[in-house]
């Protein structure tokens, strides 16, 4: 449960499942194994819980989706991801507790308010990064781009001056790594404009709408089909690529059946997150295997039950709009 809760907070800072697994996994997987949990279970929990960070703001994937969808409110998307992200965490906690009791895993240290307060005092500066982005964007203090820049400067100051965990040599490595990631995203975003023009000119969205509506006029079945398509793509393509390619093609279908683009943002992100845990590509799966030393085949076998829990949450946020739309609605963002 601590592992899953840690992913919620870390995901709010990184917004990346791969970063979550690589960072927390290197610490928590050996720690859990030392306390009596087997490596397969420890790694499966770490990997599946890492997907929460892609839903809980600030999520850079939500921003990519907002651009691909034609300028949807980033604030609304951020708020729409909170409840699904927390719901996923709760479901994974309940399932992990069930497996722990069933397999007679050792009990951890009892919860205490003093321990919670100590942890909060240590992490309060880091959590400020999340507050800058979420509060700033939601309440219109600054844009998503401005909030990212301010949060970046804040995180740099905290890392080097408060926690003193980074020197200039490490800063250079961080900048290099960030530039590589940024270059990939910028190439995809720059290509999304011409790609969108081409598919519009060729009337591909209209053809997809007619084809899918020709199969069935049931909203339930159409949404199920869309989820299946994205899940399959998630096994072979990267997340940003799926968002940029799928969004302009499927958006007309979704609008024709009255499905909210805000709700689809959460559905799409969770679909892609599940893809990160499935072979043959499965980036998070390979990272987890590398950290724990458990072969991919055996690790995936132990991950399947957690994937089923994630699919359950996916169906819930697909067919229960209130899960994603209530919070943005209460804040007047819809």
Residue ranges and their predicted role:
Residues 1-334:
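Alpha-helical transmembrane segments of multi-pass membrane transport proteins
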């Amino acid at each position: 449960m601590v592992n899953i809760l840690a992913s919620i907070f870390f995901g709010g800072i990184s917004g990346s499942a791969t970063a979550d697994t690589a960072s927390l996994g290197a610490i928590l997987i050996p720690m859990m194994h030392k306390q009596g949990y087997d490596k397969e279970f420890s790694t499966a929990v770490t990997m599946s819980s890492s997907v929460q960070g892609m839903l809980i703001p600030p999520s850079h994937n939500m921003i990519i989706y907002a651009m691909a969808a034609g300028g949807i409110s980033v604030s609304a998307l951020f708020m729409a991801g909170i409840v699904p992200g927390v719901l996923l965490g709760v479901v994974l906690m309940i399932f992990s507790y069930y497996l722990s009791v069933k397999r007679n895993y050792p009990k951890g240290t009892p919860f205490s308010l003093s321990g919670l307060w100590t942890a909060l005092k240590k992490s309060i500066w880091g959590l400020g990064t999340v507050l800058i982005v979420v509060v700033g964007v939601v309440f219109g203090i600054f844009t998503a781009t401005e909030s990212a820049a301010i949060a970046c400067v804040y995180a740099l100051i905290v890392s080097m001056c408060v926690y003193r965990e980074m020197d200039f040599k490490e800063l250079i490595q961080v900048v290099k790594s960030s530039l590589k990631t940024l270059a990939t995203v910028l190439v995809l975003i720059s290509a999304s404009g011409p790609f969108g023009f081409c598919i519009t000119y060729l009337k591909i969205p209209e053809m997809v709408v007619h084809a899918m509506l020709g199969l069935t006029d049931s909203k339930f079945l159409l949404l199920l089909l869309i989820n299946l398509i994205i899940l399959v793509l998630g096994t072979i393509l990267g997340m940003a690529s799926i968002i940029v390619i799928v969004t302009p093609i499927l958006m007309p279908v979704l609008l024709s059946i009255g499905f909210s683009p805000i709700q689809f943002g959460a559905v799409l992100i969770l679909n892609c997150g599940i893809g990160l845990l499935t072979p043959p590509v499965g980036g998070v799966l390979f990272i987890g295997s590398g950290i724990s030393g458990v072969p991919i085949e055996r690790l995936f076998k132990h991950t399947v039950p957690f994937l089923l829990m994630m699919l359950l949450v996916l169906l819930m946020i697909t067919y229960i709009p209130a899960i994603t739309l209530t919070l943005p609605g209460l804040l007047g963002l819809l």
